[in-house]
Swiss-Prot record:
Name of protein: Carbamoyl phosphate synthase large chain, N-terminal section
Subunit structure: Composed of two chains; the small (or glutamine) chain promotes the hydrolysis of glutamine to ammonia, which is used by the large (or ammonia) chain to synthesize carbamoyl phosphate. Tetramer of heterodimers (alpha,beta)4.
Binding-site residues, ATP: R126, R166, G172, G173, E205, V207, E212, G238, I239, H240, Q281, E295
Family designation: Belongs to the CarB family.
Chain ranges of the ATP-grasp domain: 130-324
DNA repair is among the record's keywords: no
Name of the top EC class for this enzyme: ligase
Signal peptide (UniProt feature, chain positions): none
Residue positions binding Mg(2+) 1: Q281, E295
Source organism of the structure: Methanocaldococcus jannaschii (strain ATCC 43067 / DSM 2661 / JAL-1 / JCM 10045 / NBRC 100440) (Methanococcus jannaschii)
Cofactor binding note of this UniProt entry: Binds 2 Mg(2+) or Mn(2+) ions per subunit.
Record GO terms (molecular function): ATP binding; carbamoyl-phosphate synthase (ammonia) activity; carbamoyl-phosphate synthase (glutamine-hydrolyzing) activity; metal ion binding
Substrates-to-products reaction catalysed: hydrogencarbonate + L-glutamine + 2 ATP + H2O = carbamoyl phosphate + L-glutamate + 2 ADP + phosphate + 2 H(+); hydrogencarbonate + NH4(+) + 2 ATP = carbamoyl phosphate + 2 ADP + phosphate + 2 H(+)
Length: 482
């Protein structure tokens, strides 16, 4: 990689739901990492309200639209040796694909770093993805890419309802949803086709209610692979990972099954030839006997930012250095200053991420959570136990709550309201679970209604039980002082 002296980095453009400050964080790290290695860095981003567009972040900053015609003019002027698109989220990958399709990369002899064109296409084209996974015997859901409503209806009737509708080349589940019948499918597919840049939606077999896990994987040019972080979505499949409460390290997966997912993740990143960071999502059935590979993001993702902050392992920085030819054993860990980046981080604490929804500002928006993102931010908290981290995260949300219960701001839900929210989750579900437990609902009933693992419901029950215990002690102290 000695021939690479000048690299162009794509930002992610305007802040939208599903693509926000996480990519500014990643892009800033990448620019600093490239400059550390003496690489002349050119940043292209249309959003001036970012850290990465500060003048000291890159050698040259272009505040221009992330459009192939504009970017070609910048390429013609700057003549970069390579482009790093994997720090710009879905926008960066889509732009790299379009530059390739227009022949601009070949015309100027530009190398693509991090992920190659075939890998990007496999990750985004569901049929290519299914074929790639079949080549290495990794299970995926039954799916089909369709370009019309009629095709969608035909395939849904073949595999049975419900089905998941996912527009191709979009972020945050935009335009997608869960169709339980033909009418819903027609409605969601019609909208989804408009959102997709290639007018294509993916009809997926439903794995609603299965557990969802994510692994952040790193690989270098010498084929060294490590798992940086394992994350568990508390909410089941059917709720977008950006809408779910997430905990790290993984809490409910037996080690034997975790090793299965770990081996699968390493097999996938090797097969796709990704050099740098990669996020892989798995669905696991409740009995923990089967899994499906749901998605591969061949780029730094929203989850990568969480994994970086949870572990202290700077994924974007190291991915940028790998992209220009460094190997994991050549890069020092920023935290220890001694061990190489090829050592997998281990956590002796619990990290909880909770999304922040803007429903206080948009009062007429449907609050139900599903496969499309509605949250506009998130908080992360660290504790020695799940209970501690959860309570800290709730307090950090800036919604006026000091915990899930017992702060004097609990709503008084009826049993009917509780059952409805447990079945059809909204942003209030975590508080409703606590209220149900306080009212004497059994753990088993809540598990049945929510599909959330019993482990997490019992952890929330510990908080509720502590509240009751403290109330008893308060009464006893009053008697003693009387």
């Amino acid at each position: 990689m000695e021939s690479i002296k000048k690299v162009m980095v794509f930002g992610s453009g305007p802040i939208v739901i599903g693509q926000a400050a996480e990519f500014d964080f990643s892009g800033s790290q990448a620019c600093k990492a490239l400059k550390e290695e003496g690489i002349y860095t050119i940043l292209v981003n249309s959003n001036p309200a970012t850290i990465q567009t500060d003048t000291d972040m890159a050698d040259k900053v272009y505040l221009e639209p992330l459009h192939p015609t504009i970017v070609e003019k910048i390429i013609e002027k700057e003549r970069p040796d390579a482009i790093l698109p994997t720090m710009g989220g879905q926008t960066g990958l889509n732009l790299a694909l379009e530059l390739h399709r227009r022949g601009i990369l070949d015309k100027y002899g530009i190398k693509l770093l991090g992920s190659n064109i075939r890998t990007i296409e496999i990750a985004e084209d569901r049929e290519l993805f299914a074929e790639a996974m079949a080549e290495i015997n990794e299970p995926v859901t039954k799916c089909k890419a369709v370009n019309s409503v009629d095709e969608a209806v035909e395939f849904a009737e073949e595999i049975g309802y419900p089905v998941i509708v996912r527009p191709a080349f979009t972020l945050g589940g935009t335009g997608g949803g869960i169709a339980h019948n033909k009418e819903e499918l027609i409605d969601i597919t019609s909208k989804g086709l408009k959102y997709s840049i290639i007018n294509q939606v993916l009809i997926d077999e439903s794995v609603l209610g299965w557990k969802e896990f994510e692994l952040e994987v790193m690989r270098d040019r010498k084929d060294t692979c490590i798992i940086v972080c394992g994350m568990e979505n508390i909410d089941p499949m059917g709720i977008h990972t950006g809408e779910s409460i997430v905990v790290s390290p993984i809490q409910t997966l037996p080690d034997e099954f975790y090793q299965k997912l770990r081996n699968a993740a390493i097999k996938i990143i090797r097969h796709l030839g990704i050099e740098g960071g990669c996020n892989i999502q798995f669905a696991v059935n409740k009995e923990m006997t089967e899994y499906r590979v749901i998605e591969v993001n061949p780029r730094v993702s929203r989850s990568s930012a969480l994994a970086s902050k949870a572990t202290g392992y700077p994924i974007a920085r190291i991915a940028a250095k790998i992209a220009i030819g460094k190997t994991l054993d050549e890069i020092l860990n920023d935290v220890t200053k001694e061990t190489p980046a090829s050592f997998e981080p281990t956590l002796d604490y619990v990290v909880v991420k909770i999304p922040r929804w803007p429903f206080d500002k948009f009062k007429t928006v449907d609050k139900k959570l599903g496969t499309s993102m509605k949250s506009t931010g998130e908080v992360m908290a660290i504790g020695r136990s799940f209970e501690e981290a959860l309570q800290k995260a709730i307090r950090s949300l800036d919604i006026g709550r000091f915990g899930i219960i017992g702060d004097g701001k609990d709503k008084d839900y009826t049993d009917e309201e509780i059952e409805e929210i447990l079945k059809n989750p909204t942003d209030e579900r975590i508080f409703v679970i606590a209220k149900a437990l306080e009212k004497g609902w059994s753990v088993e009933k809540i598990v049945e209604l929510t599909d959330i693992d019993e482990f997490f419901i019992k952890k929330i029950k510990n908080i509720v039980d502590m509240k009751k215990e403290l109330e008893k002690l308060k009464e006893e102290i009053k008697k003693l002082n009387a």
